[in-house]
Design a protein with these regions (language model features):
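Glycine/proline-enriched, intrinsically flexible loops and inter-domain linkers
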Residues: 1-347
Length: 347
């Protein structure tokens, strides 16, 4: 309690608790880990064993330069990120489609193999949760959300599930791993180890397919959170190291390197990709958070719709914008900082 707490501080007690199979491989490649909801996650990668630890500071610390290099490599070549900490579940049953349509503000995917980004609002019209929803087959959907909010998101699902048995929930968080391949050379890399056609025509944005990566089965989703060409590879977790090794081997000729959570955060902010708990929350209306294209008021009834319409009629007081901060040398705005104009807080 009586000590200095630094930005992005990671505490060591009780760790490691939950680990993905590829963690040992990531550590050998220089990973410096943090944790979310008990899961170890690679925050950044050090270039040598001597630098493979955090040095906490309110100013830029040793990871800043290396995270920048990770971002550059993803933007110019390709990067591999472990996101097995994602919260994952399957919703199925004769009432699954109707239930999910009421749970989220966006239209859920209607065709098998399609993927939509959907937001669950609370009853006041604020943003409670964000789900990636993939339709696997009739009455069967695969849901992915932030690992830090697994309990919150899955409790919300249970809160609104009908009690008549028409909807079945299956928690897949511990049984499914996720590796994210992203960057302009990601198609070249993945094409070397799968027979699936990865062209835009055959595998468009926001679609998913069952593929084989080497000898391992995976659900490949054409999407990612860093704004580059890429795929999320969701797989039975026992196949993870096989998939990881195949990708790293195939990527040698394309400058494939692992990247961590901090590089992902930097890249997603550049694209104004939002997160629940930072840019989105229950304190702000979905429209204030810039979710206009993800909220379909004309689709029919859904949780929070009427409250959101009422909020809209009264008028919004806030608007989410991306703020660029220039001429910074050794200390950065890390989020949740007040913004002043003429000594007045404006955001």
């Amino acid at each position: 309690v009586f000590t200095v707490h630094y930005p992005d501080e990671e505490r060591e007690e009780g760790r490691p608790l939950r680990q993905a199979p590829c963690d040992d491989r990531l550590k050998e490649l220089g990973a410096v880990f943090g944790q979310k909801f008990g899961w170890e996650r690679a925050n950044w990668f050090a270039p040598s064993k001597e630098l493979q630890k955090d040095d906490w500071s309110f100013r830029r610390s040793r990871w800043f330069e290396h995270v920048g290099n990770e971002c550059k490599n993803v933007a110019e070549n390709a990067g591999l990120l472990d996101m097995s900490a994602f919260a994952k579940c399957r919703i199925s049953g004769p009432g699954a489609e109707e239930f999910l349509d009421n749970l989220v503000a966006n239209k859920i995917p209607k065709k098998n193999g399609r993927v939509n980004l959907c937001h669950a609002l609370n009853t006041a019209g604020g943003v409670h949760s964000e789900f990636t929803i993939a339709k696997e087959k009739d009455n069967t959907f695969y849901l992915v959300s932030a690992g830090a909010f697994q309990r919150l998101d899955h409790d919300w699902i249970h809160k609104w599930m009908p009690k008549d048995g028409s909807v079945i929930y299956e928690n897949l968080t511990n049984s499914m791993g996720v590796l994210v391949l992203a960057g302009p050379k990601s198609r070249d890399i993945l094409s070397k180890i799968t027979r699936t056609d990865l062209s835009n025509e055959s595998f468009p944005w926001l679609s998913s397919k069952k593929i084989n990566v080497g000898l391992a089965p995976a659900i490949a989703m054409r999407m990612n959170f860093v704004g580059e060409l890429g795929w999320e590879l969701h797989h039975p977790i026992e196949y993870q190291n096989h998939i990881f090794d195949k990708l790293m081997e195939a990527g040698k000729d394309f400058s494939l390197k692992p990247f961590g959570i901090r590089a992902m955060e930097s890249l997603r902010v550049e694209k104004t990709y939002k997160l629940v708990g930072t840019e989105m929350s229950i304190e702000y209306a979905a429209f204030e958070s810039g979710l206009d294209r993800f909220v379909h008021l004309n689709k029919g009834k859904f949780i929070g719709r009427d409250a959101l319409v009422e909020w809209q009629q009264k008028g919004f007081k806030n608007k989410m914008v991306t703020l660029e901060v220039h001429d910074v040398e050794d200390a950065d705005a890390l989020g949740n900082n007040p913004i002043y104009i003429d000594n007045q807080v404006i955001g």
